[in-house]
């Protein structure tokens, strides 16, 4: 089976889940799947995907896995006790052919946030691996290894010694086995330039650093859970700070567009959070504006981190490093380009939260094609509230 452990997911699912347990245990949410590749027919693979999800829902955390989580400084004991009882339930997920009859499939995840938050990453990994295992029966492993070696070598040139990358590629990986190979090669070839992985299973298995803080779904849910819509981003950041007390201090900047983020990210947040993550829009313009914002708030940019994670490849990593090196702390999270580049077109698939407590929620990305909402009227209202054109 594809997913062999409930740890085979991104760290930020655990960090967000802990906030949900402590602050929003009664929240009810809905997620929907979308494949952005035109012409891809996923319908023939529905039964195989269902079988993998059935297996996923049979998994439990082992004592060794719980002990590992207990050893992470930001994970609290009551959360680990909850995970000891936790399992995913099939009753919260439905998969069927889309009504559009164009090869798309509908995957709807609906239920208590606390009991559905762990579906997204493994389900996306399942869809990917089911699809590629059936469309590429004899993968071009040698080509994949050649490309990987070339990419990693491009980061070991003189002058790039402090350029560090991390793996953010679980959800869109070619396969579990290839993912592990990529991580082992990255650590072997890059040494200290390999910062770690977002994947908790591989971090535990290979003694790597697990990385991650928050995702868009957390800030989106706060549109419904906060005191009023305009204050939802501030509410989300303040709630995060109350939970982690200065730990896990990387804020995600594009849920409501970067302009709205800068308006909300005042001197208090600039000093409190360790840095900011970029996930859409022009990264060079974003970085310049973020550094200028820190300076305007009388915060030394060199004390803060800029994390880049939007569709990175190695040439872009190098260009960003050369632009911002010595001006701030830097980190780069590389996803699909690292874990799914054997010469085939990767699937552009996502699972996004669309409702919380019966109300629509949305992300106003700095890349319009990333915006996903099933209620156009709410999307227009959200843009008006946050001043997004």
UniProtKB/Swiss-Prot annotation:
<dbReference type="InterPro" id="IPR006406">
    <property type="entry name" value="Nic_PRibTrfase"/>
</dbReference>
<dbReference type="InterPro" id="IPR041525">
    <property type="entry name" value="N/Namide_PRibTrfase"/>
</dbReference>
<comment type="function">
    <text>Catalyzes the synthesis of beta-nicotinate D-ribonucleotide from nicotinate and 5-phospho-D-ribose 1-phosphate at the expense of ATP.</text>
</comment>
<comment type="pathway">
    <text>Cofactor biosynthesis; NAD(+) biosynthesis; nicotinate D-ribonucleotide from nicotinate: step 1/1.</text>
</comment>
<dbReference type="GO" id="GO:0034355">
    <property type="term" value="P:NAD biosynthetic process via the salvage pathway"/>
</dbReference>
<dbReference type="Pfam" id="PF17767">
    <property type="entry name" value="NAPRTase_N"/>
</dbReference>
<dbReference type="InterPro" id="IPR036068">
    <property type="entry name" value="Nicotinate_pribotase-like_C"/>
</dbReference>
<comment type="similarity">
    <text>Belongs to the NAPRTase family.</text>
</comment>
<keyword id="KW-0436">Ligase</keyword>
<dbReference type="Pfam" id="PF04095">
    <property type="entry name" value="NAPRTase"/>
</dbReference>
<dbReference type="InterPro" id="IPR007229">
    <property type="entry name" value="Nic_PRibTrfase-Fam"/>
</dbReference>
<dbReference type="GO" id="GO:0005829">
    <property type="term" value="C:cytosol"/>
</dbReference>
<feature type="modified residue" description="Phosphohistidine; by autocatalysis">
    <location>
        <position position="216"/>
    </location>
</feature>
<dbReference type="GO" id="GO:0004516">
    <property type="term" value="F:nicotinate phosphoribosyltransferase activity"/>
</dbReference>
<keyword id="KW-0662">Pyridine nucleotide biosynthesis</keyword>
<keyword id="KW-0597">Phosphoprotein</keyword>
<dbReference type="InterPro" id="IPR040727">
    <property type="entry name" value="NAPRTase_N"/>
</dbReference>
<protein>
    <recommendedName>
        <fullName>Nicotinate phosphoribosyltransferase</fullName>
        <ecNumber>6.3.4.21</ecNumber>
    </recommendedName>
</protein>
